Amino acid sequence: MLPQPQIWLCPTDRPLIPGYQALLSSEEMARGERYQRPQDKQRFLTMRLALRILLARQLDCLPQQLQFTYGPQGKPELVDRERRSPWFNVAHSGNYGLIGLSTEGEIGVDLQIMLPKPHYLKLAKRFFAPQEVQQLESLEGEKRTKLFYQLWTAKEAFLKATGKGISGGLNQVIPDENLAKYQYLPDSGDTNHWRLSSQPLLADQGSNDNYWMAIAWCTNEVNQVESNYLPNIQPFQWPRNLDSLP
């Protein structure tokens, strides 16, 4: 059985665990203070706390013992990463965040709240491949909105996994028409070793809004994941207090 990524869904509008400051670094606290809007600060602190707690559970250590370093585009990684340490990635939009962990290789997650905006085609013409623009032009209304976010999240998930961000070339990351795998990738990716899962955030997962998520992960195996594979989305469970942490 091929190891599959683990995905957690975390609401970002809930009260923070009392005493949370003890789990974060001074750099993280300072970064949180730089946000102008309270909801942005809340979102950042929530996701960084959740990430630390999940990684600490995996590595059997205290959350505050983890140290992070950052790539050229800001992608966080663990300092002195050990062989047993998972790869990870974080995304957030609206009132929700996603955390993805993988023991096989790099992983990227993206989450977007689907808001109808008039400039989708303008963005697509700038960042998407010509055939994708044609697909969008053939649709209207909700169908166009949905396809835009399906394509955008699939592209960004891969670029986040590789640590390149949007500058890595959105128009060079092309998912297949079923959003089950990648049809074409830049030089940094072999389509035979990258998996893609694209799905909505369902109402029974707690959302009253329309969200779309994508997960991209690298594997050493080839063609061993079903084309319709959807990772299990687990609700993140907050500890009741600091004393209940490992």
Curated annotation (Swiss-Prot):
Its EC number is 2.7.8.-. Keywords: Magnesium, Metal-binding, Transferase. It comes from the Bacteria. Mg(2+) binds at D110, E156. The keyword Zinc-finger does not apply. GO terms for biological process: fatty acid biosynthetic process; lysine biosynthetic process via aminoadipic acid. GO terms for molecular function: holo-[acyl-carrier-protein] synthase activity; magnesium ion binding. Its cofactor is Mg(2+). It is an enzyme of class 2 (transferase). It holds the Pfam family AASDHPPT_N. GO terms for cellular component: cytosol. The keyword Nucleotide-binding does not apply. Probably transfers the 4'-phosphopantetheine moiety from coenzyme A (CoA) to a serine residue of a carrier protein domain. Belongs to the P-Pant transferase superfamily. Gsp/Sfp/HetI/AcpT family. This is Putative 4'-phosphopantetheinyl transferase slr0495.
